[in-house]
Swiss-Prot record:
Protein name: ATP phosphoribosyltransferase regulatory subunit
A GO cellular-component term linked to this record: cytoplasm
InterPro entries xrefs: aa-tRNA-synth_II/BPL/LPL (IPR045864), HisRS-like_core (IPR041715), HisRS/HisZ (IPR004516), HisZ (IPR004517)
Pathway in which the depicted protein is active: Amino-acid biosynthesis; L-histidine biosynthesis; L-histidine from 5-phospho-alpha-D-ribose 1-diphosphate: step 1/9
Function: Required for the first step of histidine biosynthesis. May allow the feedback regulation of ATP phosphoribosyltransferase activity by histidine.
Pfam families to which the protein is assigned, alphabetical: tRNA-synt_His
Keyword Cytoplasm (UniProt): yes
């Protein structure tokens, strides 16, 4: 019998579970203050939903053996858009939903097998509004989310913002047969692949210029305007940065415009963004999101209000960045209730109830304790830091 978890899956210890719950609880309280209501889509969906109408590769979905094509969700947005377009179709727009739950991705391991990537996410979806103010609302909420999570201040946070239409504008000047290859190089910032790309040298230098363009929004927008002139995408980004950049700066978050910002999934059409944290090794993407109007259109039976934008936060990744000093439990005291005679068990249960009423964690010895060694061993095994004796 194999007693290990499936390849890529993992067990979380009590401390990790507690931190996940604490982070998710703080986020849910914030979402509700902003008027978002909880929705809980199923873990199992039909494959045509999970592939997000072609936005997600079929190979990345962990499939279930059944009479119809089913799988485990690799992300939650597609399921919520499906629900908004069916069960909540008659509801007035905009819809503000938040969710928290586990997603499952299927990756190919080095040996050709399958690795399961299980992750706990928390996020919001704003469906049914086209206004740029919706984008500003989502980014503002993401910025405020960082404040309630209380990430250790030693980690530097960067908010990267891009636009798929801006990326398409950049790619439009290249041969259509090479667009996919160039897009991958741009999105991956793959300088090595660029050196072997079969294009003219001036085109190679132009691609490199775009790859190096990420930085302060005002400077990047000026550079893009010098190349492409004024257009609606650049104008909207200017308007957005006017509000978002000062808000982020107040919270110590650097904002950068990245013309090459792409996503693994082809869900997004318009604004895209990623929140990246420095770490002891490599940068970590702890949140990502964007506009997915095209996805809403594909799922909707109506042509009206087919707009959507959202983000998801990786609670598992955030957990590793939260300062241990910021773990605010109701009470960090854990009491062992001990007794020397079995007849005192009833009194011990009454004492435990009183401690619980005060919000104090307490456990009862299952046997009478007669020696100091027994008592100390039980304190250690139950991870208690205080003892109360029942006479």
């Amino acid at each position: 019998m194999t007693l290990q978890p499936a390849s890529g899956a993992r067990d979380l210890n009590p401390q990790q579970v507690r931190k996940n719950h604490l982070i998710a609880s703080k986020l849910s309280s914030l979402y509700q203050l902003w008027g978002y209501e909880r929705i809980s889509p199923p873990h199992i969906e039909r494959l045509d939903t999970l592939t997000a109408a072609g936005g997600i590769s079929n190979n990345e979905i962990l499939k279930i053996v059944s009479d119809e094509p089913l799988g485990l969700r690799p992300e939650i947005t597609a399921s919520i858009v499906r629900a908004a377009s069916t069960r909540f179709n008659e509801y007035e727009r905009p819809l503000r939903f938040w969710s928290a739950g586990t997603s499952f991705k299927c990756n190919q391991s080095i040996d050709g097998g399958i690795d399961i990537e299980e992750s706990f996410q928390s996020g919001v979806e704003l469906i049914g509004t086209k206004a740029i103010n919706a984008e500003i609302e989502l980014l503002s909420l993401l910025i405020e989310s960082l404040e309630v999570i209380e990430i250790d201040q030693k980690y530097k946070m960067t908010l990267l913002i891009g636009n798929t239409y801006l990326l398409e504008l950049i790619l439009s000047s290249f041969d259509s047969t090479k667009i996919d290859q160039i897009k991958k190089i741009l999105c991956d910032l793959d300088y090595i692949a660029l050196t072997t790309l079969d294009v003219k040298e001036e085109q190679r230098m132009f691609i490199k210029t775009i790859m190096n363009m990420r930085g302060k929004p005002e400077e990047v927008l000026t550079n893009l305007q010098n190349i492409y002139g004024s257009n609606s995408y650049i104008d909207k980004l200017k308007e957005l940065f006017t509000i978002i950049e000062p808000l982020a700066k107040e919270k110590g978050i650097e904002v950068q415009l990245d013309p090459t910002l792409g996503t693994k999934y082809k869900l997004y059409s318009g604004l895209t963004f990623s929140l990246v944290s420095s770490s002891t090794s490599a940068p970590v993407t702890i949140a990502k999101g964007g506009r997915y109007d095209d996805l809403v259109k594909k799922f909707s039976s109506s042509a009206q209000n087919c707009y959507g934008i959202g983000f998801s936060i990786s609670v598992d990744k955030v957990r590793e960045l939260v300062s241990t000093s910021k773990e605010k439990l109701v009470n960090n005291v854990k009491v062992l209730i001990a007794y020397k005679q079995s007849a005192n068990l009833y009194k011990a249960l009454k004492q435990q109830k009183e401690l619980h009423r005060k919000g104090i964690i307490s456990v009862i010895s299952h046997e009478p304790l007669k020696t100091n060694d027994e008592t100390n061993q039980l304190l250690k095994s139950n991870r208690c830091n205080k003892i109360e004796w029942i006479d």
